A protein has these predicted regions:
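N-terminal Rossmann-like FAD-binding beta1-loop-alpha1 element of flavoenzymes
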Residues: 11-38
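Conserved Rossmann-like nucleotide-cofactor binding loop
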Residues: 21, 44, 264
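Short loop/edge segments at beta-strand edges and connector loops
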Residues: 17, 89-91, 230-233, 238, ...
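Conserved flavin/dinucleotide-binding core of flavoenzymes
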Residues: 3-8, 51, 106-107, 304, ...
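Mid-domain catalytic core of redox enzymes
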Residues: 235-351, 364-370, 449
Length: 452
């Protein structure tokens, strides 16, 4: 895209995107006395990790919870400026809506909770499952059927994941979700068949702010940052000239660029034919989240449940989450708040009426299920996440490796979940930014020493 030519503002380090990975990158640059500027396209910082308040309800963009594996608590996260006393650790309770029952998640480790005859069918299918495929060419669908049996795969695992990622699973590789998907662990599956409860999975506990929603994480990361510019939508990049042009015609020149914007979008505006071609093989799903405030407490059957997976293809949404079961600071005690997620393709979003068409369908489906009374609905706030889940197709790894290697030649370093085109947690995104920036700084210092 051709953009107006302005005198570039020369900045040694430019950070694209003001989400948690971009803010982490900026924080590390500032702490290391590096001159930088962060460019965020929206009016506020935070990316998808933002919170808004509507009618005394505190809504995140959708359910965003802090899962930690490297650090013991939020206060231990480097550069985040978080105080543990402002956060609550929650032991996850999630369920799967199958057979008109709420089955504890992960369902594959809790088969005994299934009603008859589904339980017997799943067990028989598991006992007669095909051999687990080690071939790297195996699809995600193959992985599920060989790992858990065809009945459970068809009942829950396949429809749930296809609704979420808006793509047939035979187009994804078995590496699609890596550590985020409960493994076909025979010991745990058989324990579940015997009725021994399991709360397995990577996120058996998580952290959430006592007040203020997940934007408390953003507030900690941005605290004290000096060079964060909002309303700076980058519309053109010249990798050869190392310049970025924003929609309001500001031009920035960099020595090093750290980008948290979706990798596919970065390549498409790069003016590099090789990058544009490689990015054409990358795909992703979108998510539309409906945040709903209710003038009533949650129904008793939802007591203590944090989120609920919904595999039934006749129901428009794939997950329902309950903010008010997670943090009481999300609404007043006499009310409740939930979020409802619908998967979509990027092509679906081209239909301008999509969100308006979906909203009444979602509300009516919730009422038909008996999960709310439409008369209790106080407000609905919809958010569209254009890039929600990146797809681990068989082409993804080769394409991403080529792209990252090529970008490095221009001193461009992608960071975070969407920058690196991966399926990662918030902790992973911050760690990706931290490691990438530190490595770039160390390389630059080594180069200066060698030059001297």
């Amino acid at each position: 895209m051709n953009a107006p030519v302005n005198t570039p503002r020369k900045i040694p380090a430019v950070v694209l995107g003001g989400g948690i990975s971009g803010l982490t990158a900026a924080r590390i640059l500032q702490e290391n006395s590096q001159e930088y500027v962060l460019l965020e396209r929206c009016p506020t910082l935070g990316g998808l990790t933002r919170t808004i308040e509507v009618n005394e309800y505190c809504f995140d963009y959708t359910g965003h919870f802090l899962h930690l594996s490297r650090y013991a608590s939020p206060g231990d996260i480097p550069y985040a400026n978080l105080r543990n006393e402002e956060w609550t650790q929650v032991r996850r309770r999630s369920c799967c809506f199958v057979g008109d029952k709420f089955i504890s998640a992960p369902i594959q480790y809790n088969l005994s909770e299934l009603p008859s005859p589904l339980f017997e069918q799943c067990v028989e299918s598991y006992e007669n499952r095909p051999a687990l495929l080690d071939d790297d060419c195996a699809t995600f669908r193959d992985y599920l059927v060989s790992g858990f049996g065809a009945v459970l795969a068809d009942l829950f695992l396949i429809p749930q994941n296809e609704k979420t990622m808006a793509i047939p699973l035979d187009r994804l590789s078995k590496r699609a979700v890596r550590r985020f998907f409960p493994a076909p662990d025979e010991t745990l599956v058989r324990a579940g068949i015997r009725g021994e409860p399991s709360n397995g999975g990577y996120n058996s506990t998580f952290w959430y702010p006592k007040v203020g929603g997940i934007s408390r994480l953003v507030a900690g990361l941005r605290s004290g940052l000096e060079e964060c510019l909002v309303n700076q939508d980058v519309i053109a990049l010249s990798l050869r000239n190392r310049t970025a042009v924003t929609k309001n015609t500001a031009t920035f020149s960099w020595d090093t660029l750290f980008s948290s914007m979706p990798l596919k979008a970065l390549c498409e505006m790069s003016e590099d034919d090789g990058l544009v071609s490689a990015a054409a093989s990358l795909s992703h799903s979108s998510t539309i989240s409906f945040n709903i405030g209710l003038r009533a407490p949650l129904r008793p059957e939802f007591s203590g449940i944090h989120w609920l997976y919904v595999p039934d293809r006749r129901i428009p949404f794939y997950r329902v989450g309950f903010y008010s079961n997670i943090g009481r600071g999300t609404c007043t005690p006499d009310r409740s708040s939930i979020y409802v997620e619908v998967g979509a393709t990027p092509e679906d979003l081209e239909r301008t009426t999509l969100v308006a068409d979906l909203q009444p369908m979602v509300i009516l489906a919730l009422q038909d299920l008996g999960w709310l009374d439409i008369r209790d609905v106080d407000c609905v706030v919809a958010h569209t996440m254009r890039c929600a889940y990146v797809h681990h197709t068989p082409q993804r790894d080769t394409a991403v490796k080529y792209i990252l290697d090529r970008l490095r030649e221009y001193q461009v370093f992608p960071i975070g979940r969407y920058g690196t085109w991966d399926y990662t947690s918030m902790e992973d995104s911050m760690e990706s930014a931290r490691q990438t920036v530190m490595e770039a700084l160390q390389t630059a210092m080594t180069g200066q020493v060698d030059a001297a």
